[in-house]
Structures are given as C-alpha cells and as structure tokens.
Amino acid sequence: MRILLVEDDTLIGDGIKAGLSKMGFSVDWFTEGRPGKEALYSAPYDAVILDLTLPGMDGRDILREWREKGKQEPVLILTARDALAERVEGLRLGADDYLCKPFALIEVAARLEALVRRASGQASSELRHGQVTLNPGNLVATLAGEPLALKPKEFALLELLLRNKGRVLPRKLIEEKLYNWDDDVSSNAVEVHVHHLRRKLGSEFIRTVHGIGYTLGDA
C-alpha cells in the first residue's frame, strides 16, 4: 500500500515513515505544502496523511484543491488542531478521517487500512482468494490455514493483487505501488517478487498477461 505523507514536523514524519514502512507500507514523505500537493498528481497513492499546519500552503487549501480537481484518494488529517470547529471544517472540505496528535502509530495504520477498505468497497479487513487469506491489520497470510512466510514486498504485492481481483495490473503500476521515490529499484524487481510468490502459492495463482502485467489466476 503506497501512502503520501505531508507533515512538516521532522520528528513526527520520520517516526511515521519508519513505523509504517516496517508494517509493509510504502511511504513518500514531504515536509512542505506545495510539493506535497503536487505529489498526488504524479503517483498512484492508496491514501494520504495530511497535516494542516504546513509551510508554503495550508493543509486545508491543499485538501480543497484536491477535491475540486477530482482527486478522490482517502485523506487522513493528522494534526495538533483539536478544536471541534476545525475538525468539522476539515471533514467538510473532503477529509475522510481525522486524528489528533499525539497518536499511536498502530492506530494510524488501522485507520489507513479502514479508509482504503471503504474506498474499495470491502466490508471485511480479511482478503481471500481460493485457499489464500491475508489480513493487512496483523500482517498475517495463510495458505489452506497454514501461515505463509512472506517478505514485506511479497506481502504488499499479494495484498495489491487481492484488492484488485479481476483487474490486470500493469507492471509499472505494481512497481509504483510497492516502492517509494527513495527506493533503489532493479529493472526486474516486480518479476522477482512474482516468482517468489508463485513458488509459495502455486504457479497458477498469479497469471501473466503478456505485454500488460499480472492478475490473479483462477481460485
């Protein structure tokens, strides 16, 4: 899951990025309003964490512009502003959730997962295809009831495929979802992760659509 983080406090931002990365998220972090605003137009993010008090451009103005221009990515406002009127204003501008500082990182992750789940029309946090189940909340995947030992990028790729059943995902899109701008990505990184998942889940679990990308095989 790829997350856009716009937060000017370096201590908080570094903690969020490091913590979410350990949980399997891919995070791009911006400390100023305008670059953060523009980032949403240049990469396929699953959700956004947006602070309100930002240098260069206020978070509320950023959110207003995104919604006016049709950007529908779920937005979690994370801010020290805890006045009721400001929370209501943020939600009415188009925010999907609101969390006041201080916060627990596990709650940030849980709220992001809930936002993405609602945006994709999924009622349950558990994803399933055939004998494979995956729970993003506790980072557990199973095959026929037995735990699967997956590396973080393998888990992220499996989650991406399960959230997009019936769709063919272009290789470039998969790469953009799995990696942030700071990552050093080899040219065959996606193919390597697909190969490893097939070894663990079966060769027919992921189907290659030549010239396009990958999709789930028959359950």
From Swiss-Prot:
Residues 2-116 form the Response regulatory domain. It comes from the Bacteria. GO terms for cellular component: cytosol; protein-DNA complex. The keyword ATP-binding does not apply. It holds the Pfam family Trans_reg_C. Its main location: cytoplasm. It is found in: Cytoplasm. InterPro entries: CheY-like_superfamily (IPR011006), OmpR/PhoB-type_DNA-bd (IPR001867), Sig_transdc_resp-reg_C-effctor (IPR016032), Sig_transdc_resp-reg_receiver (IPR001789), WalR-like (IPR039420), WH-like_DNA-bd_sf (IPR036388). PROSITE patterns: OMPR_PHOB (PS51755), RESPONSE_REGULATORY (PS50110). The modification 4-aspartylphosphate is found at residue 51. Residues 124-218 bind DNA. Keywords: Activator, Cytoplasm, DNA-binding, Phosphoprotein, Transcription, Transcription regulation, Two-component regulatory system. The keyword Cytoplasm applies. Phosphorylated by QseC. GO terms for biological process: regulation of DNA-templated transcription. One of its GO terms (molecular function) is transcription cis-regulatory region binding. Member of a two-component regulatory system QseB/QseC. Activates the flagella regulon by activating transcription of flhDC. This is Transcriptional regulatory protein QseB. The lineage of its organism: Bacteria, Pseudomonadati, Pseudomonadota, Gammaproteobacteria, Enterobacterales. The gene is qseB.
